[in-house]
């Protein structure tokens, strides 16, 4: 069975259908290790990809004013137990353009493997980028994933990101994102992670509200069980009049798991405001009792509550 087919068959684990790779109206990239297995572009979109021994290097550019009708699927992964992957990508969204990127990171058999991603994203004036990233690391806990991204949100532009790793084991995950927002720009960063066994999760998301009336939200939901560990840091700085930001972190701890939440808020202008809230604890006892009173077993009730938190 080919590596391309192996990754295709894993797509449903992150909510995608393999058939999207066959649709001529949908742009995509499939990369295995440092090899590009398949790619397709559409009008208004430019994909420049290069295979190198040490990385896949690429640029994704959306023309000014273009509205890409269907999400762009970017599928990267490894279909073997061991290996390494480095992705270096530059994303540029032209002024007044609108695009949705679905990133699928697939490592179904990983026992000792590594994935690194270094990205820069620039969203032009009045443009919009929605970036949805789904991961599946298999059941073995042998994956190390280290994504790093810097994002620039232009004047009046929008950036929405949603990261999820909810099925299988996490392994070791270290996220480091920095977002700069110009005047009237908006950014919302959402992350949802379910840790098991000996998983280690480190999330650091930082936003700098540089322009007047820039707005942001960092929202994180994590459920940790067994002997897993999580350290989640959300940082928001406000530097201009009318800037508004909020950091919202909720972690649920079960078994012998450990979790920490570190909200950091800084304000450098008297007319700016940043708020935060963080909560760490066990499953809500009242919710649990209510569900059990309706006939659910304790395990079913906990599973339902957890699924609601990670929805």
PLM features: residue spans?
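Sequence-level preference for short, compositionally simple segments enriched
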Residues: 1-4, 290, 300
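Conserved beta-strand/loop scaffold segments within soluble protein domains that form the structured core
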Residues: 27-289, 293-296, 307-311
